[in-house]
Amino acid sequence: MKRKIVLAMALLGVQSLAWSAEITVAAASSLSDAFKVIAAQFEKQHPAVKVNLTFGSSGTLLQQLRYGAPIDVFASADQKTMNDAQNFFLIQNATRTDFTSNRLVLITSTRNPIIIKDLNELKHANIKHIAIGNPAYTPAGRYAQAVLAQKQLWVPLQSKLIKTENV
């Protein structure tokens, strides 16, 4: 995956390297671990270049881009946000590259005695809170909402949902 992201950085319009000693990468929070490693490797290979990393929800980063934030590379966690960036003419279409994918997972605390094998078990009275990314801002939240709605759990679980800014 790291090679794909490095390739993506090369393809995503890091053409300003000839004029600037800094590039700014805005990436989804879910990509933070990988991008920190990649940025360090990139800086090692290009000692004259400083990579500035900004992480957040894809929706928030898109808004920053829309309002003029100086972003050289934008890495969203989903197609919808990239489509929006393209529709708002915020990215160079020829540089857009799909380089990874997300997977929705359910995790529980080690202190939770309930082992969840089916999403319907989220209705269990002992489960008080369910944290998800806010569907208004995060792809993971939209994916969670879609799955819960498909299983007819979105409405029944509303009182338990804690919507977070990012993953």
Task: Label each residue range with its predicted role.
Residues 20-137:
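N-terminal segment of the mature folded domain
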Residues 13-15, 20:
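N-terminal signal peptide c-region/cleavage motif recognized by signal peptidases
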Residues 6-11:
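Sec-dependent N-terminal signal peptides
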Residues 33, 136-151:
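Bilobed "Venus flytrap"/periplasmic-binding protein-like clamshell domains
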